[in-house]
Amino acid sequence: MPNSDHANKPWAASVINKMQPVSAIDFGAGEGIYGQIIRKYSPHTYTVGVEVWAPYVTEFKLDKIYNKVWVCDARIYPHFKYDLVIFGDILEHMSKEDAVALWERVSKEAKYAIISMPIIPFPQGHIHGNPYEEHVKDDWTHEEILETFSGIVAHKTFKVTGMYLAKF
């Protein structure tokens, strides 16, 4: 889905409001919810949206939300030198090994990262013809996320998703 659990967005907004990042990159931009949150709570932030499914860029007018939009897979994005990296419901769309490798790259360059991810079994296939919507690892748990991703300093769980803030 190009969107995610809206119950966790106030937590993300609070973190972004307190942080006031100079730069932020949103992987899995989808319909641009995190970009909109950044625009509202930290309007001076330079934002980059990264979306693997090109039709979403036009459908959701991502170029109107972010300062820059890239169409590519997060796993091949060239650098992560941002104050804030957002993984808004994308890590479940790749293998655990790929998610860990991506996290390790981010932890060497970014200052902070936010993860939003289902914490209950959440199978999902292709949606609206988008093969990237499939959940490759659909059984993450809160405990597994805490054990897998280094640097987590704050978290909040909701019925379906967990939100995690990491500092590097």
Regions found by a protein language model. Name each.
Residues A54, I120-P121:
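Short, glycine/serine-rich, charged loops/turns that create anion-binding
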Residues I86:
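A conserved beta-strand element that flanks and buttresses the S-adenosyl-L-methionine
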Residues I90-H93:
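Hydrophobic adenine-recognition pocket in adenosine-nucleotide-binding enzymes
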